[in-house]
Each structure stands twice: as structure tokens, then as C-alpha cells.
């Protein structure tokens, strides 16, 4: 199965077009005012129109209420919602039922105890995202450039597909995929020159590196 690649936190036409040209499967737009990657509803609408059918548009929110979700959906017209806060399994089910869109639930992992919640979300979400837990209480829930102990995922079995996030760069993504058997990867700060500023060269290097394990496997099988 091809590795899914998501570039998150896109904020400009140039970087969005680059992500699409490079073959990203998903492009993420952040609707969370505390994030340096936050986009207004108007900008989300403008950028969303450029995507067409070249990738899945993902709206990322954090503990958003129904009104905020409805506004973001109306602006971006996403194919998927990503919830990256303290949303409960019941809240995930409610969002899916109300808006009729697939939901990706981000799960913050710091140690073994954080794995307990995974089956609860696996039962209600359409896709899971395993990310590093913020080091500081009240810190941004994602996009911090820190990784967690990937060996913890050896203990995880899910029915739903999942993406790996947290501290991924072009230097470590191939190893991360090999170590975890991740079905996909999600990157934001790892392809930036500054917080919220995507770097075209880093984006290209990341996607090339993420595809390498798959290409090597295909050559070996042939």
C-alpha cells in the first residue's frame, strides 16, 4: 500500500502548489488561532479552491465547537476533518454524525500509558494520527518538531489506518516508516524554515525520502 503523505499547515499559494506538484496525498489547513500556521476562513476558502481533486483537503481544528466547525467546512469544503485537541470518543462520533465527513483523530503519545486511549478512538474515528505529546502543559498540540518513542507503537494494533507525526524530517522519515510500519506520515514543522513558513526544498526532500522505502521495496520485488 502506498505511503500516505500529508503536508500540514499550508498558508500560501506557492507552498500549496508545491505540495500538490510534489504529490502530497493530503494538504492540511489549520483553523486554530494560537498556531503560527492558522489561516483565516477567507484564506482557507481561497487556498482550498486551488486544490481541486489533486489531494484531499483536511481541516485541522482544536477543541472546536459545532459553529466553528461549520464555518470552517463552509469555507474550505474539506474531504476530512482532523481534530487535534481533547475531543472525546463521544465528541468524535457526534462530529461524524453532524457533518457527514470522515474524522482523523490526533492522539498525543508520551509514554506507554497513552496507548490505553487508542482503542476507544479506533472505534469511532476514520483515521488516527499518532503525534508527540507537548512537552509543556498548555503547549501547542502539534507542530512542535518533537518526536516520541516510536518503539511504543509495537504494542499498538488498530482496525483503522494511521499516520505518524511528530519531529519528522527528511533525515528521519524513512527510518520512522521502517521502524513503525506507519501507513502514512504527517509533517509540518519538519519542512519549515521558521514557524509557519514552509520551505520548498525541505518539502521536496521530505516527500522524496518518504517515498524511498516504497520504491526500494518495489524494486526488490521485481
Swiss-Prot record:
Transmembrane segments: none
Cleaved signal peptide residues: none
UniProt cross-references to InterPro entries, sorted A to Z: Aldolase_TIM, PRAI_dom, RibuloseP-bd_barrel, TrpF_fam
Pfam families: PRAI
Enzyme class, first EC level, given as a word: isomerase
GO molecular function: phosphoribosylanthranilate isomerase activity
EC number(s) stated in the UniProt entry for this protein: 5.3.1.24
Top-level taxon: Bacteria
Keyword Amino-acid biosynthesis: yes
The entry's keywords: Amino-acid biosynthesis, Aromatic amino acid biosynthesis, Isomerase, Tryptophan biosynthesis
UniProt record, GO biological process: L-tryptophan biosynthetic process
Catalytic activity reported: N-(5-phospho-beta-D-ribosyl)anthranilate = 1-(2-carboxyphenylamino)-1-deoxy-D-ribulose 5-phosphate
Gene3D superfamilies the UniProt entry points to: Aldolase class I (3.20.20.70)
Pathway: Amino-acid biosynthesis; L-tryptophan biosynthesis; L-tryptophan from chorismate: step 3/5
PANTHER family: N-(5'-PHOSPHORIBOSYL)ANTHRANILATE ISOMERASE
Stated family: Belongs to the TrpF family.
Protein name (record): N-(5'-phosphoribosyl)anthranilate isomerase
Name of the gene: trpF
Amino acid at each position: 500500500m502506498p505511503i500516505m503523505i500529508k503536508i500540514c499547515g499550508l498558508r500560501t499559494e506557492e507552498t500549496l502548489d508545491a505540495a500538490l506538484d510534489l504529490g502530497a496525498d493530503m494538504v492540511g489547513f489549520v483553523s486554530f488561532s494560537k498556531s503560527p500556521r492558522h489561516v483565516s476562513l477567507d484564506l482557507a476558502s481561497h487556498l482550498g479552491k486551488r486544490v481541486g481533486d489533486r489531494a484531499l483537503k483536511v481541516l485541522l481544528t482544536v477543541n472546536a465547537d459545532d459553529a466553528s466547525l461549520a464555518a470552517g467546512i463552509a469555507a474550505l469544503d474539506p474531504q476530512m476533518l482532523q481534530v487535534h485537541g481533547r475531543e472525546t470518543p463521544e465528541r468524535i462520533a457526534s462530529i461524524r454524525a453532524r457533518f457527514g465527513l470522515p474524522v482523523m483523530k490526533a492522539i498525543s503519545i508520551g509514554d506507554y500509558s497513552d496507548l490505553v486511549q487508542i482503542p476507544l478512538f479506533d472505534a469511532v474515528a476514520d483515521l488516527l494520527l499518532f503525534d508527540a505529546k507537548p512537552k509543556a502543559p498548555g503547549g501547542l498540540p502539534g507542530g512542535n518538531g518533537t518526536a516520541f518513542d516510536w518503539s511504543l507503537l509495537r504494542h499498538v494494533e488498530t482496525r483503522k489506518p494511521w499516520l505518524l507525526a511528530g519531529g519528522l524530517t527528511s533525515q528521519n522519515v524513512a527510518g520512522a516508516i521502517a521502524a513503525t510500519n506507519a501507513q502514512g506520515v504527517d509533517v509540518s514543522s519538519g519542512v519549515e524554515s521558521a514557524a509557519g513558513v514552509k520551505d520548498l526544498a525541505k518539502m521536496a526532500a521530505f516527500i522524496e525520502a518518504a517515498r524511498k522505502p516504497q520504491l526500494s521495496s518495489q524494486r526488490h520485488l521485481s
